[in-house]
Amino acid sequence: MNTYIPEGYKSLLGVYDTQKAIGLLKRLFEDQLAAKLNLFRVSAPLFLEEASGLNDNLNGYERPVLFDIPQAGKEAQVVQSLAKWKRMALHRYDFYPGKGLYTDMNAIRRDEDVLDNLHSVYVDQWDWEKIIESSDRNLDYLKSTVMDIVAAVCDTQRTMRAIYPQLQVLPELERQVTFVTAQELEDRYPDLTPKER
């Protein structure tokens, strides 16, 4: 495992306050995001019945963690991705255009290629999905959604900085978003690969 801690790093909060702050940050951000995007919290499954077909295999080679449930006579898989499950949940909960869900997924990805500060076998990830009208499938709606997400992040940071003055030393996030299309990047950097751009 390749973890990296920058030289001279010192935590701004003690261990207890760090855990307390993480919990608060999650609650604040959930509330901000839900309000700005009209989302409702839905609990995500930890595992799914193998036969349901709702567990994504992500990139095609990752193997889910499997186990049997003898009392039910079923095979189950630890969730790897909620992409299919979220769409099923939108239908099951009778969501309508303009309304969506968010969830906190916990997963085990046993075939993770690289283990480091950002990649782990254990995944704790927020996810959201929203039903939109066909007329909303456009660049303006996408940009507006991005701006709402950035506002949720910035509003959360502002509150955290007010509650924990020690965080004032960190740079304040910018609300202004610069949008760049893939075509603009290709025009500007034609000799670079898409990944390098």
Model-predicted regions and their roles:
Residues 122-162:
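Long, contiguous amphipathic alpha-helices that act as assembly "spine/axial" helices in icosahedral shell
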Residues 2-119, 127-131:
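Class II aminoacyl-tRNA synthetase-like tRNA-binding/catalytic domains
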Residues 32, 145, 188:
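Residues that form generic nucleotide/phosphate-binding pockets
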Residues 148-197:
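Metal-assisted phosphate- and nucleotidyl-transfer catalytic regions
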Residues 81, 134, 138, 180-181:
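General structural signal for secondary-structure boundaries
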